[in-house]
Amino acid sequence: MRYFPLFLDLDGRDVLVIGGGAVALRKVETLRLAGARVTVIAESLHEALRALAARGGISLHERRFESRDIEAPGLARPRLIIAATGDRDVNAVAARAADAAGIPCNVVDDREL
């Protein structure tokens, strides 16, 4: 078995979601149910993410993800990273940066990354 299923206690932990579409929204909703503190970085954002941020549920950064965001001043170091951009190149950058920082990363719908 090459891949190992993993459960994380994310209550009160910081999670970075990269991507702002419908898939990212579903991940954010699930992470919030788990008690995670969620930061989203995306060039464009689903309106439901904006609404959630307006209620103080998540932190949003409307811009392109850069690998330095993982250790950026002003952003909490995440316990987990979710790459859900729909852009394989951006997801690959996120996966490599997470690996270099020793942070688990889930790239949505791409086991190879």
Range-by-range predicted roles:
Residues V38, L60, P104-C105:
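Hydrophobic beta-strand scaffold residues
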Residues E43-L45, F65, D109-L113:
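Short, ordered loop/turn segments at secondary-structure junctions
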Residues G56, L75-L80:
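Short acidic/histidine-rich motifs immediately flanking catalytic phosphotransfer sites
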Residues M1-A53:
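Hydrophobic, well-ordered beta-alpha structural blocks that scaffold small-molecule cofactor pockets
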